[in-house]
Structure formats: C-alpha cells, structure tokens
Amino acid sequence: MKPMLKDFSNLLLVVLCDYVLGEAEYLLLREPGHVALSNDTVYVDFQYFDGANGTLRNVSVLLLEANTNQTVTTKYLLTNQSQGTLKFECFYFKEAGDYWFTMTPEATDNSTPFPWWEKSAFLKVEWPVFHVDLNRSAKAAEGTFQVGLFTSQPLCPFPVDKPNIVVDVIFTNSLPEARRNSRQPLEIRTSKRTELAQGQWVEFGCAPLGPEAYVTVVLKLLGRDSVITSTGPIDLAQKFGYKLVMVPELTCESGVEVTVLPPPCTFVQGVVTVFKEAPRYPGKRTIHLAENSLPLGERRTIFNCTLFDMGKNKYCFDFGISSRSHFSAKEECMLIQRNTETWGLWQPWSQCSATCGDGVRERRRVCLTSFPSSPVCPGMSLEASLCSLEECAAFQPSSPSPLQPQGPVKSNNIVTVTGISLCLFIIIATVLITLWRRFGRPAKCSTPARHNSIHSPSFRKNSDEENICELSEQRGSFSDGGDGPTGSPGDTGIPLTYRRSGPVPPEDDASGSESFQSNAQKIIPPLFSYRLAQQQLKEMKKKGLTETTKVYHVSQSPLTDTAIDAAPSAPLDLESPEEAAANKFRIKSPFPEQPAVSAGERPPSRLDLNVTQASCAISPSQTLIRKSQARHVGSRGGPSERSHARNAHFRRTASFHEARQARPFRERSMSTLTPRQAPAYSSRTRTCEQAEDRFRPQSRGAHLFPEKLEHFQEASGTRGPLNPLPKSYTLGQPLRKPDLGDHQAGLVAGIERTEPHRARRGPSPSHKSVSRKQSSPISPKDNYQRVSSLSPSQCRKDKCQSFPTHPEFAFYDNTSFGLTEAEQRMLDLPGYFGSNEEDETTSTLSVEKLVI
C-alpha cells in the first residue's frame, strides 16, 4: 500500500510541475503491481515535451531488474509521438521481484546541446499463489503418496523458453519444536522436476521413518534460488489419519477381521479397541469389550465371535497410538449378527456294522440353534468311517452269539490265546528234545573193522569202549573195576610195527551216519560176552592165578596185528569185599589155575616200563588219529584217569561162556615172521602197497631207516621218548613196513588239523573217515596220503563176504588162520553190522592197547 501511495504522490508532483511550468514530462504505470508467470500485461503511459524550437528527439523506455540492475527489455518511442502508452508482455516477468521503467531522450542534432532529463517508474512483481496438497496413492502402490500443486492465477503462455519448476519433498520423523529435547532427527530429501501448470499431482515414494512421519514440500523455479512456495512440515497421521476397513454388516461365524489402513509412509503400531454402542442416555458410558494390540508393521487383527451378543447389534472399533494418546483414528462402526446356530460335541462312535471283515461305524452331532425349525449350522451332522476287524476266514464262531459281538475284545482274546499256545508248544518241544537227547539217543558208535585173526579157544581179542563208542561221552571200561589199561594215544608207547589200515573214501560219511544207530545196537551180543569174560577174569584173580598175556594192536588187516609183549604177569590183585560178595552171582571160570607162559616170547623189556611216558603210538597204516580220540585226549588233559591202570602190567583178558565148545584153532602168527612165512607176506604187502601208491606221491623210500625215526620224533613234538625199534627193522631187511615214529608224528599233526575242523562242524558219526583222508605232514619229503582205490566193503561184495583173497587186497589175509564159520561171523564185524556198499566207514574196533 505504501508503494502505491508513493507513486501517487510522485504523479501529483509531476502534474503540478507541468502545470506551473507549462511543460509536462512523465512516465506513468497503470497497475502498480504484477504477478510473475501470470498472463497479465503491464501498461506504461508516457509524455514528454520536445522544446520551444521544435527540435526532434529519440526517446526510449527501459525495463530494468532492480536487484541485479540488468536490462530485461528496451522499447523506443516514435519521433512525432510525444505521449502515448507502452505495453510490456507477461513473458518478461518470469520471476518475482522489483522492476524499474526508465524513459531517456536522445538529441537528433548533435550541434545543439540540451539539458539531460530522465523519467522512471517502479513495478513490484510477486509469485503466484500455489496450493500444495497431499494424497494417498493407489492401493497397488502403498509405498507412495502424491503431492498436488494448484494455483488460481492464469499462467502466461510462454511462446519460447518456457520455465520449469522443481518440487522438493523433505521427510522428517519429528517436529521442529521437538528436536531441541531429542537427538538429531532423521531427515530425507527428495526432488522432482515438472512443467509449469495451473494444477497437477506429482507422485513421490515414501521414506522409511516409522510410526511418525512429517513431510515438507518446497516449490522452486528451475535455475533460480527463489522459492515459489513452501508448505510444511505436515503430520501425515493427522493429515490422512488411520482408517479401519471393514464391511458395514456381517454374520459372525468364527471371528470378525479388522484391517487398519495407516497414512502414507507410516507404519502401524497401536491398539484396536472394540466396544458396543450404548444407548443415548445421559451419563451412559461406553463399554469396551476387548483390545487387540498390533505390533509394528502388522495391519490385521481378528476378534472372536464369542465377544458379541446373540442377535444383531452395532459395534464400533477404534485405533489408537500409544505414543500419541491425544490422537485416535476415526471411529468406525458396523452391524454384527451372531446366530445361535452352532454344533455340539461329537457323540461316541457306534459299534461296527460287521463282526468280521470290513464294517462301518458312525457318529453324530447336534446343531444348537435358537430356531429349531430351520437349523442352518454349516457342516455335516453325520460322520462315518471304516472299521476293519479280523478276517472272516481266520476266525469263524461255531454258532452265532445272540449278544452283540464285541469286535475289539474278541480279537484281543484270540491274539492272547494264540501267543500262549505258541509259547507252551515251544516249551514242550524243548523239553521233549532234551529228554530224547539225554535218554533216548543210542550211543554213537563207529563202524568197527574186520579182524582177520584167530586166537585160542579160551581167549578172544576184545576192543575197548573207546573203539566202539568214540562219539559218546567217556564211560568206564566193561570190566567191573573200570581200571583197565587205557590211555590216550599220547600216553602209550607200544611199537606197533606191522599194522595196515586202509583210508576210507569221503563218500562213506553220509551212509555211515545213516546206519549208525542200527549198527550200534548190533554190537550188544559181543559186548555181553566181553563182560562175562571180565567176570571170569576176576574169579581167576581171586584164586591167585597168573596168566601169560599178549598185547595186540588190532587193525583192519589181521595180518598186521602186532604182539606187543609176552610176559608173565604178576599175580592178580584179589577182589574187593564188595566184589567177593557178588561172586555167587557170577559164572565160574573153566580156566585152569596155572599161568600160561609162552616160551618163545621175550621177557618184559623197557618197552613196558615207559608206557606212561611214551608218546602216542599208532599203526603205520593209520595216517591220522580218530577225531574222538583226539577229543578224549584234550578233555582228559594229558594222561587221563581212565587211561592209566592201577597195575602197570595189568592186561585185559576175556573168555567165552562155559557152555561154548572149544573150536579148532591155530596159533596166531606173531609180527616176527618166520622165514617160511616172510615171502608170502611180503608179496601180499607189495601188492597192496602198489594199489595204494597210485594215489600218493612216490616220495617215500622203500626202506625206512632208524635215522628217519629220530627225524620224525623231532618233527612231531613227542611227549616222551619213543619205543625202540623192533627186531624186524634192520638195515638189511627189505621190509616195507613203516616205523612207529612215522605215524606218531602224523598223529600230532593230525590232531592239530582235525580239531579246528571238528569244532566247525561238530561231532559227526562219520568223522573217522574224514580224519583218515587227511595226511600227516611230517616233512616236504615224506608228506603223502594213503588212499585206497577200493573200500573194504567193496572187497567183501566183489570177492568174499569175509576175507578177499585177491592179491590187491592183501590186508585181508586168510592164509595164516583157520577159523570156523561161527568165528568168522563173530569177527566179521562190518558184515555183522550189515553194512552195504555205501557204508564204508569201517574203522578199527580197538584202541592202541588190547589184551587177549
């Protein structure tokens, strides 16, 4: 207002001067003010006096910017025009500020000077008024907001060089008055360039500030520092507020969901409260039903239907910010209808529709509603499921029960009874098998071998129990006292010089095990006679008789049975009182009371003295010791209790029943052959050995010298000194019989090799044949295995039932014996057992010490 008064006063002053002086010069504006960027035009009136002499002058009007003193534009007046109006267009005024209009005359004739004068006018230009507005963006872009720029002033249509404006947005998290008491505020600035328009929306992205956000908008002209307009800081929460989004009316089934829509660039954090709208009574307070807190960033919450009353009622929701208790969102109300229709609890399952196989069971629930005529509970009131009981084929009742069958109970009873029955069956079977093994199984007896020997009518060669029942547990001797001279193979040192035992092929194992029990029962009659002979021997001992005994080693070849020694034994010990008391039940012996001593036999030698300390002696024909004997050696632990006799010179004797007639017999040929018998024996030996040599390496020499014996003793690890060589082993005698030490070493190696095999397979009735197949590795030079091409049973079938006479089977010798038919049947043990071609597991029926 003051500038206008000043201009008006200046104008009056000019008019007065002109009137007084009679000559008026002035420059006058029609409008004292102007709006920049507007489409208004500025008009300037002028008047000047050219002088008394009428000299023409050039006059111009300049538009100057007062702040910078720069000329915006210049306009020239006509020479013959002393007064008039000049028009200045809108595009000259792009920026607000102070402008000057100046009129300056110029002389046309330089020769005539004139005084300088200048007229001017002042113009004030202002910015147009722009209104700034903020708005939410579309839902698809919740992280943005819009800035609106609007003006009511018409803008100048710039023909060229149209100016641009810049919109700056500043985000802060606090108000300026709150910054003094808090830490440094967060401030984020963003700008956008836009064209000059009377109204427009400019979209901006949000800056992450938090639950509180303030925005300041600044509008500038591009390239200029002047600010057209500035708005802010604007509280976005107060500007936009929080909105609760919900349907106006709903039927509550499980819950009511309320969504909070926060202001732009603001995160939700507060409490949603629900209350029932109270009647409009004075003094009536609003009842708050529940409050749900929303953590930072969470927008949705659900209220359970149990909070609302049955029927249709109006409920209102409100959102408040805990940090700004003075501010709350606009209250939103809605109608909520809650029906009474709801489901009750499920009833128990019904019984299965079938007693076996697949059935169906059902359960129901009831709809609880205030309108029983038309229940509208959502869901199913009936539920069915399959129930599977036991299969019909597995359990069928004998008669249908009138009562309702209890499927699960009966099924459990069947399982229980079945389990108990199975357990009882297993227990009974275990007890029966144990009793059968302990009492019902016969003794596992080996198949005895044939013996081609004949003895005196009063004595007959017997076998110890270990030869008959090797696989069974150790029992006492057949004698009453049980003190017979027994011993493990490692405890006896009898030089069995001439003995041959053919190995048995491996195919005899199966047949031998099958006929084992039947063969073991057939040995009972001979064993009865052996026991009777023991009783008669004790009667002779009671009378103080002495006897001449012969110790033989019996093998499958009777010719190679070896006489150990012949010595008059000491008078036998008298019986114990218990035995004397039982004499009346025994059969008297028919033997004479004088001792029978053979004149041709040598006295006891050192052989008998070191019997207990000599190593195990075995026939040369026996390549390996039997597995049962090896087992007895290990179980007895060195010299066994049964192996050592009470009297070192005790020998077992036997006799037949008193009713038996004495049959013709011949003296058995000793191992020391006469010159008359040597050629025939040697020929048979060579014939048999030729048949065996086909199955073993030709590495053994024809003669076994005494120095070889020492080597074998060292290789076999003997337990004691070996017996001296018999007389038949001389350097000049061409006999093919091996030495005792030869197979004594093989015995030790055989035990070491057969024991792991037996531990792996267990005891078998046919283990003898397996052990005989293995050779005794003494040295690489003398390692061989004796294999017979034909078994003894095949020889019996092909040649003769008792003794074959073919030279190839020389181990069955008939030339030196004359046996009756009864004696041959008695001695033909394999034939007596009824062995066939498949049962070839015929082994010797004697231990290494047999006394006749």
UniProtKB/Swiss-Prot annotation:
GO cellular component: cell periphery; cytosol; endosome; endosome membrane; extracellular region; focal adhesion
Known outcome of mutating residue 775 to P: In ANIB12; uncertain significance; loss of function in endothelial cell-matrix adhesion; decreased interaction with TLN1
Bias type Basic and acidic residues, positions: 655-669, 686-696
Region forming the signal peptide: 1-24
Residue intervals of the TSP type-1 domain: 340-393
Cytoplasmic-side positions: 435-852
Keyword Repeat: no
Any Pfam family: THSD1_N
Gene3D superfamilies linked: Thrombospondin type-1 (TSP1) repeat
Extracellular side: 25-413
Region listing for Disordered, in residue ranges: 444-517, 624-799
Effect of residue 639 to L: In ANIB12; decreased function in endothelial cell-matrix adhesion; decreased interaction with TLN1
Annotated glycan sites: 39, 53, 58, 69, 80, 135, 304
Extent of Basic residues compositional bias: 645-654
Transmembrane feature ranges: 414-434
Disease note: Lymphatic malformation 13: A form of primary lymphedema, a disease characterized by swelling of body parts due to developmental anomalies and functional defects of the lymphatic system. Patients with lymphedema may suffer from recurrent local infections. LMPHM13 is an autosomal recessive form characterized by fetal onset of pleural and peritoneal effusions and the presence of moderate to severe non-immune hydrops fetalis that often resolves with age. Affected individuals show relatively normal growth and development, apart from mild ascites and hemangiomas.
Function: Is a positive regulator of nascent focal adhesion assembly, involved in the modulation of endothelial cell attachment to the extracellular matrix.
Record's protein name: Thrombospondin type-1 domain-containing protein 1
Originating species: Homo sapiens (Human)
